[in-house]
């Protein structure tokens, strides 16, 4: 027969002990989501221009920050960025690299966090297609991030020599604010896993996972990339492979989970990065034996 113990005023009931899973969940830091998505001008792999599919993929992602590439309004008369802003409720930051009388084409940044500073980085090289990057400082709310977050969203060129020059310019810009929590993301168009642009960026950011995002129906190439400084802020990286994402664009979105309120560590100095660049360049230029 069980005994019944009376509960007296002033008694404090002891909490039930946590299971190991509950304890791990309570100790885990909060996270937020960042994505990069080349939307191919809203044209799907079936050749149809359907912006609502892009909006649908963004709804699936539920990311807090999204870098977009190939955002186009020049040939359709349709303002893609305004449409996506209105459909999703994000703050929209344009970063056109081509501006003509009939519209614009280039990058964009969608964010739930208001920007406190935005500038454009010109990455154009010679007669190649104009390229650029959006360099935005976002004011994250308490509980998401301990300090302003710097986000650089870009789309690099198609030619190896072009990309090398563009990455050098990005490294110079990154070195202007050492120690600031930073995310660099976008379509880097780097087909070679050991190409110098990737090695330079991996050296600066202490590496990053590579995830295949192209082509969307059967991805084999990691053209879309994301790096974080400090490296410890990056929790996971994956491609978003929903049925809608496989048809809405020729790229899959790249989705990363970032730890909130990371410990800030000093980024490499510009001198250290320059030394690393020179060393990597010498190694790459040496003939194989």
Language model segments and positions:
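A short beta-strand-loop structural module common to alpha/beta enzyme folds
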Residues: 67-72
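Active-site regions of metal-assisted phosphoester/phosphodiester hydrolases
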Residues: 1-65, 76, 86-87, 91-95, ...
């Amino acid at each position: 027969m069980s005994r019944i113990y009376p509960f007296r005023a002033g008694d404090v009931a002891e909490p039930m002990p946590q299971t190991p899973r509950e304890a791990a969940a309570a100790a885990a830091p909060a996270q937020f989501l960042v994505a990069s998505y080349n939307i191919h001008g809203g044209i799907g792999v079936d050749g149809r221009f359907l912006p609502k599919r892009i909006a649908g993929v963004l709804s699936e992602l539920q990311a807090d920050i999204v870098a977009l590439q190939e955002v186009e309004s020049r040939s359709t008369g349709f303002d893609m960025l305004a449409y996506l802003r209105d459909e999703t409720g994000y703050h929209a930051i344009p970063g056109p690299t081509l501006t003509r009388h009939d519209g614009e084409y280039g990058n964009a940044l969608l964010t739930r966090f208001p920007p406190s500073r935005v500038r454009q980085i010109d990455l154009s090289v010679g007669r190649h297609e104009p390229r650029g990057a959006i360099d935005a400082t976002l004011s994250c709310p308490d509980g998401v991030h301990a300090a302003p977050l710097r986000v650089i969203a870009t789309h690099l060129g198609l030619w190896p020599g072009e990309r090398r020059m563009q990455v050098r310019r990005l490294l110079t810009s990154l070195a202007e604010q050492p120690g600031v929590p930073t995310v660099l993301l976008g379509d880097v168009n780097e087909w070679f896993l050991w190409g110098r642009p990737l090695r330079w960026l991996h050296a600066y950011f202490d590496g990053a996972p590579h995830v295949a995002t192209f082509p969307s129906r059967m991805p084999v190439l990691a053209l879309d990339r994301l790096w974080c400084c400090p490296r410890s802020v990056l929790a996971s990286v994956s491609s978003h492979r929903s049925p809608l994402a496989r048809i809405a664009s020729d790229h899959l979105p790249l989705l990363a989970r970032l730890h909130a309120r990371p410990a800030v560590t000093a980024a490499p100095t510009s001198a250290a990065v320059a030394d690393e660049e020179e060393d990597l360049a010498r190694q790459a230029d040496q003939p194989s034996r």
